[in-house]
A protein has these predicted regions:
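Conserved active-site-proximal phosphate/metal-binding subdomains
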Residues: 134, 141, 153, 158-247
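An acidic- and aromatic-residue-enriched active-site/binding cleft used to recognize and process polar
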Residues: 85, 112, 147-148, 180-181
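Active-site entrance/lid segments in N-terminal catalytic domains of soluble metabolic enzymes
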Residues: 1-137
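Gly/Ser-rich catalytic serine loop of serine hydrolases
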Residues: 116, 144-152
Length: 247
């Protein structure tokens, strides 16, 4: 951890900072990072360029989330994000936002076409079902992700025009999450072999008909335990659904 932070400090321009992504469901790592060992807040206190935390792989209960946000703020980590993948989880983040107002937090809504750990609900469905509730919170920043791999698709969400397909008015988000596409960028330290494999993996064509009767019309699933288009859907060490390259 210390070695990677030192390397990060060498790479970042002066004044640039990063957010630390932590998996809430991985209790060993969570306790190491923010529990009894507190290696992340301690590293921040020593001057590391970390100014926020992304809480992924689960949403804490309300009381725990409020205490966490207050603790992180006190530790000099003002930017706190939660990454829900279901309607219920988004509404939990809304409750958290109301409880900590006027502190601003971020909700990173991630749909079922995201790489790695993923939801079984489509991004558009998640946004359409909760948009009004999220926007009713002045202290909640809305970010969307999962299957956004091109500038044009990102622009649809930033402008809000993604909602037109459902007969809805513009529903713009404040930002987008880019994961898999960023891994293939020239600047990424991903190994060349992995980059090539990502590029060559065909995936599921956007006009393909899904065999999964539960798949939303706007989404393209790889059914659990199966492989489609060079991608497989399995379970991670957290017993959570995860997409992986078939290699």
């Amino acid at each position: 951890f210390d070695r990677h932070i030192a390397a990060l400090e060498d790479e970042l321009e002066e004044g640039r900072t990063v957010e630390f992504n932590a998996m809430f469901m991985d209790r060993y790592l969570w306790n190491l990072q923010f529990g009894s060992s507190r290696i992340v807040p301690k590293k921040r206190a020593s001057g590391a360029p970390i100014d926020g935390v992304v809480v992924s792989a689960g949403i804490p209960e309300l009381d725990e989330a409020v205490a966490l946000i207050e603790s992180l703020q006190a530790d000099g980590l003002p930017y706190v994000s939660f990454k829900p993948g279901t309607v219920d989880q988004i509404r939990q983040v809304v409750r958290i936002a109301k409880a900590v107002s006027p502190i601003t937090i971020m909700v990173q809504v991630e749909g079922g076409e995201a790489g790695g750990h993923h939801s079984w609900e489509a991004l558009d469905d998640l946004l359409a079902a909760t948009y009004a509730e999220v926007r009713a919170c002045d202290n909640l920043v809305l970010v969307a992700g999962g299957g956004i791999g091109t500038p044009e698709r990102a622009a649809d969400y930033i402008s809000g025009q993604w909602a037109h397909a459902y007969g809805l008015p513009d529903m713009p988000v404040d930002g987008v999450l880019i994961g898999t596409a960023a891994m293939t960028a020239k600047e990424a330290h991903t190994s060349p072999e992995v980059k090539q494999l990502l590029v060559k993996t065909p995936g599921i064509p956007t006009d393909a008909k899904s065999d999964d009767v539960f798949a939303p019309q706007a989404a393209h699933w790889v059914p659990s335990g199966k492989s489609v288009g060079g991608m497989s859907s399995g379970l991670s060490h957290l017993h959570a659904d995860i997409y992986e390259l078939e290699n």
